[in-house]
Design a protein with these regions (language model features):
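Active-site acidic/histidine proton-transfer and metal-coordination neighborhood
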Residues: 1-79
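Structured core elements
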Residues: 47, 81, 108-110
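Acidic-and-aromatic substrate-binding clefts and catalytic sites of carbohydrate-active enzymes
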Residues: 54-61, 84-93, 114
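Amphipathic alpha-helical packing elements
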Residues: 68-69, 77-97
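A short alpha/beta connector and helix-capping loop motif
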Residues: 89-114
Length: 114
């Protein structure tokens, strides 16, 4: 039975960074280095998890939804992970699932029960 290897980064910066691309490029390179290591693709399913941009919490988020969805789309064998606790209160993961299925044959879910 395969296992999911979830890759994620911290929530973001509380200060206002001058360089918003550098951390993303380093994160992208780091994930690519991790995925370049040999592993059994039948037993390990790598995924990338986005972090929410919280109002008043971060100035910007390195591993945003745009970043992780784009990364997964460009890297065969890597799937996105949707965490139902990482969206704004007005967003519903259940509404996002059909949209994701249009582009990804599979993705991972992280469900938090409230």
């Amino acid at each position: 039975m395969p296992c999911v290897m979830n890759i994620w980064t911290g929530d973001g910066f509380k200060d206002v960074p001058a360089d918003r691309m550098g951390p993303r490029l380093r994160y992208k390179d780091s994930i690519e280095q991790i995925l370049s290591e040999p592993y059994d693709k039948n037993l390990v399913k790598p995924c990338v998890e986005s972090k929410v941009f919280g109002i008043g919490v971060e100035s910007y988020t390195v591993g945003s939804a745009e970043f992780t969805l784009s990364f997964a789309a460009m890297h065969d064998g890597c799937m996105p992970l949707m965490d139902n606790g990482h969206y704004h209160p007005q967003e519903y993961v259940s509404d996002k699932i059909p949209a994701m299925l249009c582009f990804y044959p599979e993705f991972a879910l992280h469900l938090s029960l409230i």
